[in-house]
């Protein structure tokens, strides 16, 4: 049996070309780990470590088992999945089927790796304003993405409780940091501010009310939690990772404008009918992360937004 606290040395990152996966891979490399980045297709920019194109949502788990054994992988991080640009069936394949096949692949390894699966706060669904969601609270998501992520989490938990694998699900808040996806609200706003900066113009931003409160968490803090969860096999099966406080997306956009220093004119626009948020409130209780992993959020949302802006404004022009 692997010691409870063993730093990962040979790590496979599914979704290794994505927002979290790419930065995680780079950090692992910097810490001396060997990294195998896996994704459906080769990225435009090289992924951290060695890259292998592998679409597990349509692939054979036995092939992945053979690859993981051959690479002597001791930790697998599932940063794959998603919702943007996908229909319900594609989301099911990318989130549920992929996770089930990953569990099968890891369980069949000659020396099964530790699995760290990245879940989401959206698995909780509706929550009363002012409350903090605990891992033991009933999860009742309304939106399809939350339902599918919950199904993936439940598959991991079942496998852990049955002794098939050593694993943990990190239920992440809304992660903010360098490399923010361009289709996200902050990614879109950062791109518009950067375009105005480059042109020497005033940025013109149209903003909906954005009054729903969310638990946003810094990317670097998130990576800290991933590494701690990978190293500690005694952690409980589900652990929340967030700041433990709720903020509006509007607040983060305002922080982004301040950090950019770009003159900005804001036009207030109503939200389209039928596009309201799943819930007006998300706030994670992170007590379990503190007690089981020794993790607490250290960085402010301003620091997270600052890193987002620095990465956006210094990126080479495509």
From Swiss-Prot:
Enzyme Commission numbers on file: 1.1.1.344
GO molecular function: dTDP-6-deoxy-L-talose 4-dehydrogenase activity
InterPro entries listed in its UniProt record: Epimerase_deHydtase, NAD(P)-bd_dom_sf
Enzyme class of the recorded protein, top EC level: oxidoreductase
Cystine pairs: none
Tree of life domain: Bacteria
Catalytic activity entry: dTDP-6-deoxy-beta-L-talose + NAD(+) = dTDP-4-dehydro-beta-L-rhamnose + NADH + H(+); dTDP-6-deoxy-beta-L-talose + NADP(+) = dTDP-4-dehydro-beta-L-rhamnose + NADPH + H(+)
Location of the active site: 145
UniProt signal peptide: none
Keywords assigned: NAD, NADP, Oxidoreductase
UniProt protein name: dTDP-6-deoxy-L-talose 4-dehydrogenase (NAD(P)(+))
């Amino acid at each position: 049996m692997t010691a409870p606290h063993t730093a990962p040395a040979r790590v496979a990152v599914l979704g290794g070309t994505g927002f979290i996966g790419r930065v995680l891979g780079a950090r692992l490399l910097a810490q001396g780990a060997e990294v195998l980045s896996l994704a459906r297709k080769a990225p435009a920019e090289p992924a951290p470590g060695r890259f292998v194109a592998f679409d597990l949502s349509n692939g054979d788990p036995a092939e992945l088992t053979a690859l993981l054994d051959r690479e002597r992988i001791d930790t697998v991080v599932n940063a794959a999945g998603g919702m943007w640009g996908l229909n319900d069936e594609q989301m099911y394949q990318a989130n549920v089927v992929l996770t089930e096949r990953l569990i099968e692949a890891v369980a069949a390894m000659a020396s099964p790796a530790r699995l760290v699966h990245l879940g989401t706060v959206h698995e909780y669904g509706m929550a009363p304003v002012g409350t903090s969601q605990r891992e033991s609270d009933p999860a009742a998501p309304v939106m399809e993405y939350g339902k599918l992520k919950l199904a993936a989490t439940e598959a991991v938990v079942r496998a852990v409780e049955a002794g098939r694998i050593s694993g943990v699900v990190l239920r992440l808040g809304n992660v903010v940091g360098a490399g923010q996806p361009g289709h996200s609200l902050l990614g879109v706003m950062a791109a518009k501010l950067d375009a105005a900066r480059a042109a020497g113009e005033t940025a013109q931003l149209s903003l909906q009310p954005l009054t729903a409160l969310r638990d946003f968490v810094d990317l670097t803090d998130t990576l800290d939690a991933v590494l701690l969860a990978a190293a500690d096999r005694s952690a409980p099966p589900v652990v929340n990772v967030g700041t433990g406080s709720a903020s509006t997306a509007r607040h983060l956009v305002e922080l982004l404008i301040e950090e950019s220093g770009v003159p900005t004119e804001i036009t207030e626009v109503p939200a389209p009918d039928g596009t309201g948020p799943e819930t007006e409130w998300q706030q994670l209780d992170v007590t379990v992360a503190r007690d089981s992993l020794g993790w607490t959020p250290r960085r402010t949302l301003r620091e997270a937004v600052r890193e987002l802006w620095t990465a956006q404004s210094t990126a080479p022009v495509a």
